[in-house]
């Protein structure tokens, strides 16, 4: 198919990547421009409506305009039903996005992926040239910004068929783009969920569990969903906690302990009846059991402070260490946490050369001092 300048094709591909040393089986959104053969990609943890819209929005803003027409396959992310006469029922979120940016859409016939052959080829090209070997980075958001620059630089080569550079042909694409809207489009999804007695809720057909706060137990909560985060919000639309969005078709849980620890610190007597006690790490339960009842509120308050400062995992590690020393006081807890989380590295023992003489240890006999002190005391009495 011949495409006029300004049109684009869209498709997802499979990709692996390491973020902070953790391997992810993710997806990457490809947008290709058949006229010039310019292409762009964005990496994501999965393939959903938030990934699609965030990726398109990022690419539109980077290239400074909106393609006149976008070609898609019949992905469930967009298409809810294919009608007999060839038209499609589309998701409400995508229709609002399309209306906001003003582009037209074309959907390929079922089993006819060749109708968007340019982007099919670009999916493979991007994988071979930008995702092999498996990329490693610290933060996905920043890496996606780097990918846009790399894709732009990739246009500085000759077109496979036309006697010109891709970057120059892409200027013709740009001349036909629609202008970016004056107002920004919110790509996040907003949903109302019902929390259980522990102030937690489920997404993805009950597979993914997220916490809110004991304050929001057995109630309805508005949640904001992006490709990266799940964010429960209060009645004033303020963020309560922020979870990294869970991906995968298996049971997972994301627990933010800070609101629960703060609540328990105010009512330590309800610790074992709250339901939260049962899901605490075993060492933390043992530690709290050893504490005096009168000290539990203060201990929980300190654990909450340590969690806020360096995360629950580090706070739990601190509890495990002080438990080894059978120390259940607040000062030991704070001191151990400072030791474990200090940026000052603990130096190993210094090794001495064999030529340096070894001194025998000197033992001090304090009994003579005791005798002298007793005699001195007698003389003054």
How would you label these PLM feature ranges?
Residues 1-17, 82, 89, 167-174:
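Basic, flexible linker segments flanking DNA-binding modules
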Residues 123-224:
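Active-site-proximal acidic segments at structured loop/helix or strand boundaries
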Residues 230-381:
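Protein C-terminal end segments and domain termini
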Residues 66-86:
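Acidic/histidine-rich, metal-coordinating catalytic segments
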Residues 94-95, 99-116, 135-137:
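RNase H-like polynucleotidyl transferase catalytic core
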Residues 1-39, 47-54, 186-201:
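Mobile-element integrase/transposase regions
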Residues 72-73, 84-85, 105-127, 143:
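RNase H-like two-metal-ion nuclease catalytic core shared by retroviral integrases
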Residues 42-69, 90, 247-251:
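Active-site beta-loop-alpha junctions of metal-dependent nucleic acid enzymes
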